[in-house]
Curated annotation (Swiss-Prot):
UniProt lineage: Bacteria, Pseudomonadati, Pseudomonadota, Gammaproteobacteria, Enterobacterales
GN (gene name): maeA
Feature type site, description Important for activity: D270
Binding-site positions, a divalent metal cation: E246, D247, D270
Cofactors required: Mg(2+); Mn(2+)
Subunit structure: Homotetramer.
NCBIfam families xrefs: PRK13529.1 (NF010052)
Binding site for NAD(+): R157, D270, N418
GO biological process, one term: malate metabolic process
Organism expressing this protein natively: Salmonella dublin (strain CT_02021853)
Record note on cofactor: Divalent metal cations. Prefers magnesium or manganese.
Protein's name in the database: NAD-dependent malic enzyme
């Protein structure tokens, strides 16, 4: 499949008849013209009327509205995706705000949990550990030769739901749907992959419908050797691929990123994408308040790879704003289930050890507890920003939020855990506990809050603001790596598109209807930074913009011409 440019050329294809109708990337359904029906042996296989894609999308929208539950809507949309991808993306594009929570978080969580139950049709690649020696052959079975973006998971830490085995495939499928819907990357360029290394979820192992390898998860050297076989096979098949690691467990996520980020063009969205969108949100929120991020004190609940990744990017940004590294680190406080991370805490992971507070600096704190709880930290630090990445519901209690508000007139509270069932506090409660003074951004979508007859829109700190633009920028520029500076440029660009900053009112993040505009801007910034960093060939700004335009796929049908195989 070629990328659609401004003037879509005719596409020459060898398929015909029922085979063509079964090819999701090429199928037009009732939109095949009279001439195409004749040339491709489709006469009589479709109803008489030739429809436009908008007419098809209107019918699909009416059918969609007939489903009452979010999971049924998800299944319906996935069925369209698996039969006619162009129609799927036109429908999603027409109703993005309505459908994004259905094709991705929070509904995708339920789809992952019920993957084997609701399975309809194969999509993507499943590589099981018993098949590890056939890795090259498996990737050769992928019919699309021009794959440019892979999202891969091993299913061990799916959202806040834990080990879902091969059910985790729902995440790469959903993520790549957003690469296309938000970032304009052709679906012909994308490939979802799940590494089936077993599961420790006993419920799945006991489920007679479970479709994955029924075996406890492999670990340690066996696990890392298997992942390495996969990476090497991908490099052999698609040397210029962009590989996104998704929903790997904390113990593996950072080691894999560290090992491969300089070997293959790759990033971890849970660590780097979440950090980029969070930092972009915080830059915008700080500017809207007339200050800088470097002036804020920040407390985290959750010191896993995602939380620590956000913290490190905040530290990098505040250094850019003029702080020394030591001063920047003193403004960030990490709390996990064992309390505040300090230099006397044993058994910390390497990425956590860099974010400890020195106990000598805490001697003046007003507390009698040996373990410094979140409430102790909030009471003594008096933070401006509170970020939740714990994956545990209800941990931002009324006492904690009111204590924060006591010392901060306009607190920024970001319960980012997904899905909505795992959020640290609901926006409704946070707004009420702060008398309507908090700026709230969440990880999953929430409806606006009505408090004392005033409406408070809730920004969704969604990685979809970031990763589609990064992907488009990498493809357009031909970047060979994703650097920290490229991620920072994405954060800065997102902040520049904040309605709250630009207009003095509204959401801190752009409306979802504007996400393609934001993705294009991020793609340009990322591509330009890649050139400056020497990981992409330097071109003029005009040439880079043209490459972005040329690679931005639109859900429009093209004219088909018949060719022989």
């Amino acid at each position: 499949m070629e990328t659609i440019t401004k003037k879509a050329r005719s596409l020459y294809i060898p398929y015909a008849g029922p085979v063509l109708l079964e090819f999701p990337l090429l199928n037009k359904g009732s939109a095949f013209s009279v001439e195409e029906r004749r040339n491709f042996n489709l006469s009589g296989l479709l109803p008489e009327v030739v429809e436009s894609i908008e007419e098809q999308a209107e019918r699909a929208w009416l059918q969609y509205q007939g489903f009452k539950t979010e999971i049924d809507k998800h299944i319906y949309l996935r069925n369209i995706q698996d039969t006619n991808e162009t129609l799927f993306y036109r429908l999603v594009q027409n109703h993005l705000e309505e459908m994004m929570p259905v094709i991705y978080t929070p509904t995708v969580g339920a789809a992952c949990e019920r993957f084997s139950e609701i399975y309809r049709r194969a999509r993507g690649v499943f590589i099981s550990y018993p098949n590890r020696h056939n890795m090259d052959d498996i990737l050769q079975n992928v019919p699309n030769h021009n794959i440019k973006v892979i999202v891969v998971t091993d299913g061990e830490r799916i959202l806040g739901l834990g080990d879902q085995g091969i059910g985790g495939m729902g995440i790469p499928i959903g993520k790549l749907s957003l690469y296309t819907a938000c970032g304009g990357i052709s679906p012909a360029y994308t490939l979802p992959v799940v590494l089936d290394v077993g599961t420790n979820n006993q419920q799945l192992l006991n489920d007679p419908l479970y479709m994955g390898w029924r075996h406890p998860r492999i670990t340690d050297d066996e696990y890392y050797a298997f992942v390495d076989e996969f990476i090497q096979a991908v490099k052999q098949r698609w040397p210029d691929i962009l590989l996104q690691f998704e929903d790997f467990a904390q113990k593996n996520a950072m080691p894999l990123l560290t090992r491969y980020r300089d070997e293959i063009c790759s990033f971890n969205d849970d660590i780097q994408g979440t950090a980029a969108v969070t930092v972009g949100t915080l830059i915008a929120a700080s500017r809207a308040a007339g200050s800088q991020l470097s002036e804020q004190k920040i407390v985290f609940l959750g010191a896993g790879s995602a939380g620590c990744g956000i913290a490190e990017q905040i530290i990098a940004q505040t250094q850019r704003e003029g702080l020394s590294e030591d001063a920047a680190r003193q403004n960030v406080f990490m709390v996990d289930r064992f309390g505040l991370l300090t230099d006397r805490m044993p058994n910390l992971l390497p990425f956590q050890a860099k974010l400890v507070q020195k106990c000598d600096n805490l001697q003046h704190w007003d507390t009698e507890n040996d373990v410094l709880s979140l409430l102790d930290v909030v009471r003594n630090v008096k933070p401006d920003i509170l970020i939740g990445v714990s994956g545990q519901t209800g941990l931002f209690t009324e006492e904690i939020i009111r204590e924060m508000h006591k010392h901060c007139p306009r607190p920024i509270v970001m319960p980012l855990s997904n899905p909505t069932s795992r959020v640290e506090a609901t926006p409704q409660d946070i707004i009420a506990w702060t008398e309507g003074n908090a700026l709230v951004a969440t990880g999953s979508p929430f409806s606006p809050v009505i408090w004392k007859d005033k409406i408070y829109p809730i920004a969704q700190c969604n990685n979809a603001y970031i990763f589609p633009g990064i992907g488009l920028g990498v493809i357009a520029s031909g970047a060979s790596r994703i650097t920290d500076e490229m991620l920072m440029s994405a954060s800065e660009t997102l902040a520049k598109h904040s309605p709250l900053v630009n207009n003095g009112e509204g959401l801190v993040l752009p409306a979802l209807k504007d996400i393609q505009v934001v993705s294009r801007a991020i793609a340009f910034a990322v591509g330009k930074m890649a050139q400056q960093q020497g990981v992409a060939v330097k071109t003029s700004a005009e040439a880079l913009q043209q490459a972005i335009d040329d690679n931005f796929w639109k859900p429009e049908y093209r004219d088909y011409r018949r060719t022989s195989i």
